């Protein structure tokens, strides 16, 4: 008997939406990354993108535990000498709350071209309005 190998044409991707209201950031991002990778499916294949599309609503209402709301710092580098920049969790939540969830989920996905294609299936919105109604997403309780 031959081993089953999934083909790109056989992959079925569904659309789901989740509500981030009063969810803990790390646990929430972990559950989303599993869905984006497709590890919840029987036909999961490590070298293929078998995951679903995820729409995250109410990103502005996400929670963090402890003192992370004040103390957590996000770093990035501009590429120039002395170009390290830092922003606190509170500052990012005021500017763009969706960015916090995107950073957390992106760190939990594989690095490389496969991870980038998985990350493109994540759509994050800071409120309840989204522009993917035509895809008829189903509610997913995380």
Curated annotation (Swiss-Prot):
Gene Ontology annotations of biological process type: negative regulation of translation; translation
Listed InterPro entries: Ribosomal_uL13, Ribosomal_uL13_bac-type, Ribosomal_uL13_CS, Ribosomal_uL13_sf
GO molecular function, one term: structural constituent of ribosome
PROSITE patterns: RIBOSOMAL_L13
Xref: Pfam families: Ribosomal_L13
Annotated keywords: Ribonucleoprotein, Ribosomal protein
Source superkingdom: Bacteria
GO CC annotations on file: cytosolic large ribosomal subunit
Signal peptide stretch: none
Family: Belongs to the universal ribosomal protein uL13 family.
HAMAP family, sorted: Ribosomal_uL13
Self-association and partners: Part of the 50S ribosomal subunit.
Reported function: This protein is one of the early assembly proteins of the 50S ribosomal subunit, although it is not seen to bind rRNA by itself. It is important during the early stages of 50S assembly.
PANTHER family, sorted: LARGE RIBOSOMAL SUBUNIT PROTEIN UL13M, RIBOSOMAL PROTEIN L13
Name recorded for this polypeptide: Large ribosomal subunit protein uL13
Originating species: Buchnera aphidicola subsp. Schizaphis graminum (strain Sg)
Organism classification: Bacteria, Pseudomonadati, Pseudomonadota, Gammaproteobacteria, Enterobacterales
């Amino acid at each position: 008997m031959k081993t089953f190998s999934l083909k790109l044409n056989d992959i079925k991707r569904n659309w789901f939406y989740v509500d981030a209201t009063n969810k803990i950031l790390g646990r929430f991002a972990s559950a989303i990354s599993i869905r984006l990778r497709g590890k919840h499916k029987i036909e999961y294949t490590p070298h293929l993108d078998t995951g679903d599309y995820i729409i995250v609503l109410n990103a502005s209402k996400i929670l963090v535990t402890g003192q992370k709301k004040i103390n957590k710092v996000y770093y990035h580098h501009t590429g120039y000498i002395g170009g390290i920049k830092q922003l606190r969790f509170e500052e990012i939540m005021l500017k763009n709350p969706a960015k916090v969830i995107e950073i957390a989920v992106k760190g939990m996905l594989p690095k490389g071209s496969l991870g980038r294609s998985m990350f493109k299936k994540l759509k994050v919105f800071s409120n309840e309005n989204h522009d993917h109604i035509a895809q008829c997403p189903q509610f997913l309780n995380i």
